[in-house]
C-alpha cells in the first residue's frame, strides 16, 4: 500500500517459530511437534499424486457459547434491572498467519488471568499514551490509516497502528520495522533488541522513541486491517480492539519472554495452531505443562475470545495464509472496517450463547 493508502504489496515470506537459545529451541520444537501430532490437530496426509480439493466454504459461526468460566457473571449481569456496561479500553491485536502442513495457521499466545483477548489468543493489548508519539513511517501514512480505520482523529489512528506493532514485538518478538522502504530488521532476538523489548514491557521508553534512537521506522505496509472487536457487555474487563493481520517477516522467528524464574515454560507458551483445528473440535493449545489436564485438549471457545474463532473461520475459508492476506488487501481502502459485537442469544442445552453481529 502506498502512502496514500491506495494499494497493498504482497505479504512477506513466512517463517517458523523458534526460541532464543539451543535448549529452548529444542523444547519449542518438541512442543510444536507435539501440538501438530496431537490427534485433535492432525489431518490425514494426502496420498502421493493426490490433489487436495479446493477449500470448502465455512460459514461464520451463527452463535458462540459463553465460556463456562464466565457463565455465572453473564447470568448475574443479565438479571440486573439496570445493567451497567463498563467502558471498553482501546486496544490493538494482531493475527499472525502462515501456511502449515495442515493448512493455514494462527500464532496463538497463552496468558495467565482473564484478559479480554482470552487465556489463549492473539498477541495484543491496551493502547498507551506513548503509542501516540510521532515516528518515521514506511507505507500507509497516519492519514491513510485513519481513513481505513474509520477514525477522524489522526492521533488515534497512529496510536492503534503503533500499539499493534509494539504488542506484537512484546509478546512474540516479531518486529515490523526497518531502516527504509522495503527493509525489515532481520534478527530482533539480539541482546540489544531484547533490552528494548524489556524496556517496552516495563513501560520505559515507548516504541516510537526506541525507533527514533535507532534510526528506524514502522513498516506499516506489513499490517492489514481486519476488523474492530468490542467485548461482550457483561464482561468486567472489556476491549474495543482494532484487529490487524500480518505474516512473519523474513529472517525473524517468534519467541516468548519467560516470566522470572520460569524460563523452562517459555517454549510452550506460544504455538502455531491450524485454523481448522480451532473450529472443528477439541484442540491442543499452548500453555504451561499440564494446564489442559489429562486429555491435553480443550474446546477453543472455552479459552479464546470470539475474534480468534471468527478469524479462524475466515482463515480456513481462504484456504491459505497468502489468500487470506491478499483478500484483506483487495479494495481495502474502499471498504468500511467491520465492527464485531457479541449480542445475547439465549440459553440452549444448558449453555448461554452469544451471537456475533457486524455493523
Question: Where are the language model's segments positioned?
Answer:
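N-terminal leader/linker segments that precede catalytic domains of diphosphate-processing enzymes
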Residues: 2-359
Amino acid at each position: 500500500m502506498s502512502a496514500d493508502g491506495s494499494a497493498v504489496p504482497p505479504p512477506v515470506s513466512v517463517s517458523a517459530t523458534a526460541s532464543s537459545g539451543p535448549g529452548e529451541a529444542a523444547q519449542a520444537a518438541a512442543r510444536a511437534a507435539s501440538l501438530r501430532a496431537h490427534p485433535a490437530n492432525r489431518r490425514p496426509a494426502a496420498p502421493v499424486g493426490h490433489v487436495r480439493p479446493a477449500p470448502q466454504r465455512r460459514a461464520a459461526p451463527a452463535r458462540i457459547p459463553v465460556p463456562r468460566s464466565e457463565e455465572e457473571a453473564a447470568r448475574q449481569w443479565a438479571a440486573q434491572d439496570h445493567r451497567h456496561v463498563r467502558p471498553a479500553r482501546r486496544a490493538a491485536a494482531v493475527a499472525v498467519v502462515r501456511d502449515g502442513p495442515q493448512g493455514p495457521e494462527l500464532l496463538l499466545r497463552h496468558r495467565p488471568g482473564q484478559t479480554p483477548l482470552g487465556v489463549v489468543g492473539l498477541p495484543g493489548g491496551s493502547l498507551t499514551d506513548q503509542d501516540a508519539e510521532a515516528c518515521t513511517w514506511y507505507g500507509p501514512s497516519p492519514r491513510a490509516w485513519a481513513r481505513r480505520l474509520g477514525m477522524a482523529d489522526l492521533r488515534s489512528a497512529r496510536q492503534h497502528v503503533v500499539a499493534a506493532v509494539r504488542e506484537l514485538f512484546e509478546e512474540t518478538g516479531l518486529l515490523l520495522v526497518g531502516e527504509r522502504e522495503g527493509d525489515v530488521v532481520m534478527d530482533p532476538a539480539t541482546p540489544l533488541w531484547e533490552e528494548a523489548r524489556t524496556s517496552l514491557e516495563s513501560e520505559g521508553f515507548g516504541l516510537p522513541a526506541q525507533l527514533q534512537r535507532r534510526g528506524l521506522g514502522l513498516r506499516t505496509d506489513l499490517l492489514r486491517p481486519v476488523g474492530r472487536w468490542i467485548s461482550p457487555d457483561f464482561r468486567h474487563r472489556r476491549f474495543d480492539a482494532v484487529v490487524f493481520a500480518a505474516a512473519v517477516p523474513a529472517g525473524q522467528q517468534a519467541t516468548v519472554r519467560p516470566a522470572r524464574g520460569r524460563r523452562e515454560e517459555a517454549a510452550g507458551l506460544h504455538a502455531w495452531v491450524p485454523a481448522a483445528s480451532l473450529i472443528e473440535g477439541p484442540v491442543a493449545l499452548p500453555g504451561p505443562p499440564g494446564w489442559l489436564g489429562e486429555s491435553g485438549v480443550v474446546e477453543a471457545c472455552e479459552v479464546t475470545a470470539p475474534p480468534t474463532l471468527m478469524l479462524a473461520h475466515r482463515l480456513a475459508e481462504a484456504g491459505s495464509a497468502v489468500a487470506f492476506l491478499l483478500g484483506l488487501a483487495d479494495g481495502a481502502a474502499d471498504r468500511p472496517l467491520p465492527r464485531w459485537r457479541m449480542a445475547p442469544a439465549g440459553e440452549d442445552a444448558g449453555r448461554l450463547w452469544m451471537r456475533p453481529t457486524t455493523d
